[in-house]
From Swiss-Prot:
The keyword Glycosyltransferase does not apply. This is Major pollen allergen Lol p 5a. Keywords: Allergen, Signal. The keyword Signal applies.
Amino acid sequence: MAVQKYTVALFLAVALVAGPAASYAADAGYTPAAAATPATPAATPAAAGGKATTDEQKLLEDVNAGFKAAVAAAANAPPADKFKIFEAAFSESSKGLLATSAAKAPGLIPKLDTAYDVAYKAAEATPEAKYDAFVTALTEALRVIAGALEVHAVKPATEEVLAAKIPTGELQIVDKIDAAFKIAATAANAAPTNDKFTVFESAFNKALNECTGGAYETYKFIPSLEAAVKQAYAATVAAAPEVKYAVFEAALTKAITAMTQAQKAGKPAAAAATAAATVATAAATAAAVLPPPLLVVQSLISLLIYY
């Protein structure tokens, strides 16, 4: 079944266009295995006067609205017709956004072919499986970019990371993982396509070791991060290097975005003065007191379920 390449792929590309300076998802995107039932749409349409302020955020709100409408249109169709109906509805809703995205978010256009290849090639042969795989991939792509852009207007409240459940003392490592990831993503973006995964993993391990003062030699010393990565790309571990890197980066993107949001929410203004007064002491002893990865476990579980 043919896909209208530059219509459908545009919205998968949304999750692939931001560089490390704007988000962690440069060239990131992955295609989970087909689900037994169609995936739940990534988010609800934004209400009038939503919180989106940038062109990219506003575009994402429109994408989510069109996505939900297309899923709803296919919901009651026979399994063999679901993909065709979804594609037609989604393409129709996107017509008015193509020109807008080209003018206001020009970085999308160069990513269209890559987005199409990563998403559509993962679709199964049968129409039923193709629909599930495609919608699941699109759902995950939208959730990744929603977190990266912090478009809370298109993210249900139930999907927010609840920092109150995370012990304050265990938030210390978040900034260190975040910094290490940015260093690694920047290094990987400059590497040839087939080398991205190797460069990213090596750079991330090195940066994590340096940022934590040797407390964590590699990301594999944080079991929950390693488990999340394995879970995310288990089905595609033998895929092409560029796909493996995209999956790896997307998994860590979601985890670190969750931890960063939790960290911000866990620092009330009333405690700002106290926190500032203890920064020097904390920095001097960080390597010795880095907490166990319970924070990573909690925030990662939340994100893998809800993003």
